[in-house]
Regions:
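Domain-level signal for soluble alpha/beta catalytic cores
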Residues: 1-498
Length: 498
């Protein structure tokens, strides 16, 4: 009776396995279809998960249905899941099942205009439903301060930029919509595309001697060195110099391992790069940072000339500390890799070489291989494995070599320094398995004898796994860089100092 369309409004379904997400969307859309709905709005999405399949189902049931998919993104063009809006819009547009695309929520009118510029040309009608400005919190309540007339006039101006559908999201009231209608009727607003579409100049991949050595089949050696747990990095830098003198190709720097705060891996990587000229490979976990913090660090690393990194989800925070220390986990390692890749493709950073972790000690290794393939699809170029300290790990490594063509694999070696150390790793460190024969070999040895044995065992493992790897990844125990330097020198001597 009002001459208006009625839309079935469906928010994002997240946090479930893919099959369950599709099932939930199917239930929601079938309920609306049974009630007679023929116009659907999928709003506030951060990814396309389940959307194309659901739209296809709607079209199969009701070919005349109209489907509008709306994404929520920050002004820089990235969603909270780390996807760039242009990629998301392209995916749903090319599916053929979506009738219109757009943006809603997160920001007000002017920041949302940036998304229109970033989007460029789109073959589908474009929708904008911004918030009524930025929120403020007073006495625990959220308010939006954008005046209706400003909202209406500003949004009406974007119609001149080719926007076909306009509306409001958080904080908008009937008066905001009335003001918008008045502005549209009066022809208010002028096209405001000052510089046309934003154009990002593509950056070429930086030269990385470590990565070039991988590609050339030179079997480079990377060594992990934990950052200090104080504000003094002198001992760390001395150890890095010692390893550099031994001939390592790169230093990897853990990011708050076992969820304990240490010196920031990215900042320390910049210092290593500037002070030593040794390639650093910082780890980046998803546990401690949101999208803004991650992007800031990536921009800084790019400026520092650090272009290799290991993306990992991160160890969980111990139960006893969770009241004081909160996890973030906005991403997992796959989403983080995809986000880093998109930053490079957009020209925001010099493209990174992103590596992931591969647990060769897993009891059900096929699931690890399946996960590794998904990581490669997300942009990872290779994997650093957990330490090989058992026959099972070596065989899994061989399987990985056969199963992951195109991936660079760096085989993990961790020197065992005592029987106590071996039993601790076997019993209390997730992802590590130490064979009993190795544990027993350390019985009764003093420190010097144990280190000599650690060198021999590590060199034996290095020789055994070399046919299946592209490089070595040696993990330094207890900051004993002199011990690791002996292993590095032993590997290089056996290989003819290649």
């Amino acid at each position: 009776p009002f001459g208006s369309y009625v839309f079935a409004d469906i928010g994002p379904v997240t946090g479930l396995p893919p099959a369950d997400i599709l099932e939930e969307y199917r239930f929601l859309t079938d309920t609306f279809l049974a009630a007679g709905a023929r116009h659907f709005l999928f709003e506030t999405n951060s990814s396309t998960e389940g959307l194309v399949e659901t739209a296809a189902h709607i079209k199969q049931v009701a070919p005349d249905a109209f489907v509008l998919t709306s994404f929520s993104a920050f002004p820089g063009g990235y969603t909270r899941d780390g996807f760039f809006v242009e990629e998301l819009v392209r995916e749903v547009t090319e599916s053929g099942y979506i009738d219109a695309v757009g943006f809603n929520c997160v920001s007000g009118v002017r920041p949302m205009k940036e998304l229109v510029h970033l989007l460029g040309t789109c073959s589908l009608p474009v929708s904008l439903m911004p918030n009524a400005g930025h929120p403020i919190v007073i006495d625990g309540r959220t308010f939006y301060e954008s005046a209706p007339d400003y909202f209406g006039t500003s949004l009406a101006a974007l119609v001149h930029d080719g926007i076909s559908i306009v509306g409001g999201c958080c904080g908008t009231t009937p008066e905001h919509i009335h003001a918008l209608c008045r502005a549209l009727a009066a022809g208010a607003g002028e096209a405001d595309r000052e510089n046309g579409q934003y154009v990002h100049a593509a950056m070429t991949a930086a030269q990385s001697p470590f990565f070039e050595a991988l590609k050339a089949g030179e079997i480079p050696i990377a060594v992990e060195l934990d950052p200090p747990d104080t504000g003094n990095a002198d001992k760390f830098m001395v150890g890095a110099r010692e390893l550099m003198a031994a001939g390592v190709s790169a230093i990897t720097i853990a990011d708050n391992p076992i969820a304990r705060a240490r010196m920031d891996a990215a900042m320390l990587a910049g210092r290593v790069q500037r002070s030593l000229g040794l390639e650093p490979i910082p780890h980046m976990t998803c546990r401690d940072r949101n999208l803004n913090a991650i992007k800031s660090i990536l921009l800084g690393l790019s400026a520092e000339g650090v272009h290799n990194m290991i993306a990992i989800t991160g160890d969980p925070i111990p139960t006893a500390e969770r009241d004081e220390v909160k996890s973030v986990y906005q991403f997992n390692s796959r989403k983080l890799s995809s986000f880093i890749k998109s930053l490079g493709e957009r020209g925001d950073v010099v493209p990174f070489h992103v590596f992931g972790a591969l647990n060769v000690n897993a009891l059900h290794f096929p699931s690890q291989l399946g996960l590794a393939k998904k990581k490669m699809e997300a942009g990872m170029t290779g994997f650093f494995t957990q330490p090989v300290l058992s026959t099972r790990a070596r065989e899994n490594l061989r399987t990985a070599r056969d199963t992951l063509p195109g991936a660079f694999i760096l085989g993990g070696i961790m020197p065992v320094v005592s029987e106590r150390n071996a039993r601790f790793m076997e019993s209390e460190i997730a992802g590590i398995h130490v064979e009993e024969r190795i544990i027993n070999a350390y019985h009764g040895l003093n420190r010097a004898e144990a280190e000599d044995l650690a060198v021999r065992i590590s060199l034996e493992i290095a020789k055994d796994i070399e046919p299946y790897i592209d490089g070595y990844y040696i993990i330094t125990p207890f900051a004993r860089t002199a011990l690791v330097a002996r292993i590095v020198e032993g590997i290089k001597t056996r290989r003819g100092a290649k």
